A protein has these predicted regions:
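Mid/C-terminal beta-alpha module of Rossmann-like enzyme folds, strongest
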Residues: 196-197, 203-258
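N-terminal Rossmann NAD(P)H-binding glycine-rich loop of SDR-like oxidoreductase domains
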Residues: 1-22
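NAD(P)-dependent short-chain dehydrogenase/reductase
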Residues: 141-199
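NAD(P)H-binding glycine-rich loop region in Rossmannoid oxidoreductase-like domains
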Residues: 41-81
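NAD(P)-cofactor binding segment of oxidoreductase domains
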Residues: 59, 73-101
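Rossmann-fold cofactor-recognition segment
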Residues: 30-45
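Catalytic helix-loop patch of NAD(P)-dependent Rossmann-fold dehydrogenases
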Residues: 80, 85-88, 108-150, 154-155
Length: 298
């Protein structure tokens, strides 16, 4: 199997390099790769030449404009990366008869209510990021290519910056913390996403009827506030230097912390379709976060 991975240096892309390697010949590309492997998503049409050069049976797109607040001030760039480029890759995949794997987000929903969203639930993005990611989904579906779209949320990895690292740093520096309590979701490891992707690619190649849209997040749910407390208390139990006392971590509402982009309060995603289709049991979010903490604190 010839696999083209674009966006290989991001959190998910880095883990995909590991997870996809056993499946076949893997060509991993990013915006700073040397020619002819350069994946310039700001010039989406150049991606056709990349696909023609590699001639893959599977294209995995892990590239995106994920700076949610920044997207509000640069919507054209966000649209090029999140909507136009996936559409070009989809057309190239259809022309070659290749499978396109793409990642989307809970931000395509408006975050109302408390029930987990299914794949068929009405969308209603609140931000430029969410809108452009939805447009990317729509472009892929409209292309008619074989595709696998995985919506996810609250993605983290041991490599690079993440929420847990930030909380640990602040907890060691400050006497008090305020953390948002009314946004709820499931922290999902990039390693879990990559492993599910590899499993799903094998399955879809054998059973094409499994292609389509799925939700992929870790099991369980938490708020950013409870997530922060879990991280800090775990580190304290391991003897790490934590300055802030448990009672000095205060919950605050999203409304008290305004940002350029609106965030969905309800980021719960229903994963029953994914688990049933591919015979999976997704682990609880605490398992993945604890594993990540052991890695970054070792």
């Amino acid at each position: 199997m010839n696999i083209l991975l674009v966006g290989c240096n991001g959190q998910v892309g880095w883990e995909l390099q590991r997870a996809l390697a056993p499946l076949g010949k893997l060509t991993a590309c990013d915006f700073d790769s040397p020619e002819p492997r350069r994946a310039d998503f700001s010039k989406p049409e150049s991606l056709r030449a990349l696909v023609d050069a590699i001639q893959p049976q599977v294209i995995v797109n892990a590239a995106a404009h994920t700076a949610v607040d920044k997207a509000e001030s640069e919507p054209d760039l966000a649209r090029a990366l999140n909507a136009t480029a996936p559409g070009v890759l989809a057309e190239a995949a259809r022309a070659r008869g290749a499978l396109l794997v793409h990642y989307s987000t809970d931000y395509v929903f408006d975050g109302s209510g408390q029930a987990p969203r299914t794949e068929d639930a009405p969308t209603g993005p609140l931000s430029v990021y969410g809108q452009t990611k939805l447009e990317g989904e729509q472009a892929i579906a409209a292309s008619g290519c074989a595709h696998l779209i995985l919506r996810t949320s609250w993605v983290y990895a041991a490599r690079g910056g993440n929420f847990a690292r930030t909380m640990l740093r602040l907890a060691a520096e400050r006497d008090a913390l305020q953390v948002i309590h009314d946004q709820v979701g499931a922290p999902t490891g990039a390693d879990l996403l990559a492993d599910v992707t590899a499993h799903a690619i094998r399955a879809v190649r054998e059973r094409p009827e499994l292609q389509g849209l799925y939700h992929c997040v870790a099991a369980g749910e938490t708020s950013w506030y409870d997530y922060a407390r879990f991280v800090i208390e775990w580190a304290r139990a391991q003897g790490r230097p934590i300055r802030v006392a448990p009672e000095a971590i205060a919950p605050i509402a999203t409304a008290a912390y305004p940002t350029p982009a609106r965030r969905p309060l309800n980021s719960r995603l229903d994963t029953h379709r994914l688990q049933a289709a591919f015979g999976l049991r997704l682990p609880h979010w605490q398992q993945g976060v604890e594993r990540m903490l052991r890695e970054i604190l070792s």
